[in-house]
């Protein structure tokens, strides 16, 4: 049975904005009408995410965000979540500089990205103008973005 459970922790990194981040995630879940969830979010370094990326996706390199859905095989958008999101803060430091955005915004964008994958959205490219998932991601970010 799914309930409302949200767990956050860090692996190999320090993070000081847990309360604000927790409330941000709750606002995203609410905005997306997700009422039932068991979600863990791990903020980590490149070494940690690279190990997982190599093990589960056969890509032995760091990445920004990974999502692990416990409802594998679902082909439709589901408004229940049971899964994990892993985000490399170290990776986001570089991408925030590359895209000229604040670190907290890049963290929020990648958190939304992970949540959208968990409810069934996918994308074939990183085209923010034409990919439905990425268009939704940016809309959710505009509506829920917070400074912390």
Swiss-Prot record:
UniProt key word Hydrolase: yes
Main location: cytoplasm
NCBIfam families according to UniProt: rRNA maturation RNase YbeY (TIGR00043)
GO cellular component assignments: cytoplasm
A GO MF label: RNA endonuclease activity
Similarity comment: family membership: Belongs to the endoribonuclease YbeY family.
A Gene Ontology BP annotation from the UniProt entry: rRNA processing
Keywords: Cytoplasm, Endonuclease, Hydrolase, Metal-binding, Nuclease, Ribosome biogenesis, rRNA processing, Zinc
Name the UniProt record assigns to this protein: Endoribonuclease YbeY
Native source organism of the sequence: Borrelia duttonii (strain Ly)
Top-level taxonomic group: Bacteria
InterPro entries: MetalPrtase_cat_dom_sf_prd (IPR023091), YbeY (IPR002036), YbeY_CS (IPR020549)
Cellular compartments annotated: Cytoplasm
Cofactor binding: number and manner: Binds 1 zinc ion.
Main function: Single strand-specific metallo-endoribonuclease involved in late-stage 70S ribosome quality control and in maturation of the 3' terminus of the 16S rRNA.
The UniProt record lists the keyword rRNA processing: yes
Enzyme Commission number(s): 3.1.-.-
Annotated binding of Zn(2+), by residue: 113, 117, 123
Cofactors required: Zn(2+)
